[in-house]
Amino acid sequence: MGFIGKSVLVSLVALWCFTSSVFTEEVNHKTQTPSLAPAPAPYHHGHHHPHPPHHHHPHPHPHPHPPAKSPVKPPVKAPVSPPAKPPVKPPVYPPTKAPVKPPTKPPVKPPVSPPAKPPVKPPVYPPTKAPVKPPTKPPVKPPVYPPTKAPVKPPTKPPVKPPVYPPTKAPVKPPTKPPVKPPVSPPAKPPVKPPVYPPTKAPVKPPVSPPTKPPVTPPVYPPKFNRSLVAVRGTVYCKSCKYAAFNTLLGAKPIEGATVKLVCKSKKNITAETTTDKNGYFLLLAPKTVTNFGFRGCRVYLVKSKDYKCSKVSKLFGGDVGAELKPEKKLGKSTVVVNKLVYGLFNVGPFAFNPSCPK
């Protein structure tokens, strides 16, 4: 305990002794007041004069100081207990509360109450509690300091790399022209002889023969017909109702027994007729007076049909106005032999009749 702690403790003990003595004196004075005059006791705290009407007391009233012996005991006990448990920090609060309460109560209540009650009420406990509470506090623990942190080493900075400077370019010197040396003629090399190869034989050219003229082919003329008789072939169909208005044979069917007529215009009108077979095919032989030399004046007409439901001549390939004869140009098929007579073969058509379709 330091010097400051000791001085505070001594002053606290002295203050406690003073307040306890004052309080006990007040209590003793209250106990003596019932036998005295009705004047208030607190104002005659010194020598008390006897009341005039009571003459049987020859001597004045004994002084109220004898009860002052009681405050002597507390100071003796009080200093003994504090040294046993020296508080580190003396509490200051209890001493201030104890002296405030006792002085205020006596002036409020007049000393009219019976003498038996005042000794019971005196607050003897507060003075005793005040010195007791301070030592009961546990000794103040030494301040716990936070664990000392290990000295933080400053972060080691990475070794500072020396600044890398770009490679300093060598000072570009202006191109110093080399000293112009006199033109040194290179040493005259001996003339390099070209490698001597064996004489290459000239390519043997084939003997140039005079240009052979391509064989002159005679001009191809259309096959010349010998004078022959005329035979005309073709087919006849019945058009379908769906395509009756079009010049097409889609859906058409061959007609059997249809009549075809050949007309050759000359000095004499020559005619010939024939009918178709079940496949609609016909071969019309011209009269023997008509030869292949005069076929250009001949025409073939579609005359009539055996089927009355399909008998209207259509305009397909000129069957209604007469179709021109076209000679067959395929070799080997341009002639036909009938009854040991050779006929030149010509083509017409195909022809067709329009059907009578329901509306």
From Swiss-Prot:
Triggers of expression: Down-regulated by wounding, abscisic acid (ABA) and jasmonic acid (JA).
Glycosylation sites: 71, 75, 79, 82-83, 87, 91, 95, 99, 103, 107, 111, 114-115, 119, 123, 127, 131, 135, 139, 143, 147, 151, 155, 159, 163, 167, 171, 175, 179, 183, 186-187, 191, 195, 199, 203, 207, 210-211, 215, 219, 226, 269
Signal peptide boundaries: 1-24
Chain intervals with Pro residues compositional bias: 67-215
Compositionally skewed regions (Basic residues) per UniProt: 44-66
Sequence repeats: 90-109, 122-141, 142-161, 162-181
Keywords annotated in UniProt: Cell wall, Glycoprotein, Hydroxylation, Proteoglycan, Repeat, Secreted, Signal
Tissue: Expressed in vascular bundles of roots, leaves, sepals and stamen filaments, and pistils but not stigma.
GO BP, sorted A to Z: response to jasmonic acid
Keyword Glycoprotein: yes
PANTHER family in UniProt: NON-CLASSICAL ARABINOGALACTAN PROTEIN 31, OS01G0164075 PROTEIN
Role this protein plays: Proteoglycan that may contribute to the strengthening of cell walls.
Family: Belongs to the non-classical AGP family.
Name of the molecule in the record: Non-classical arabinogalactan protein 31
Gene name for this UniProt entry: AGP31
